[in-house]
Amino acid sequence: MIVPWQQISPEALSNLIREFVLREGTDYGESEYSLEEKIAQVQQQLECGEAVVVFSELHETVDIQLKQKF
């Protein structure tokens, strides 16, 4: 189920984005980006609708996914 990111508290959203970018295997291409830059990129993807926050009822987890993959 897609959860509107605007309905998540700023602190929880920040923690979710941070967890997402810190995961091993998250690919940002050939360029090196700082943690702050990666966080800003994910925030921008959420704001423009390229990424979505997804809640799994089965696993009771929250994740960020590219909209095209969801």
Swiss-Prot record:
UniProt cross-references to InterPro entries, sorted A to Z: UPF0270, YehU-like_sf
One Pfam assignment: UPF0270
Sequence similarity: Belongs to the UPF0270 family.
Name of the protein: UPF0270 protein VV3048
Species of the source: Vibrio vulnificus (strain YJ016)
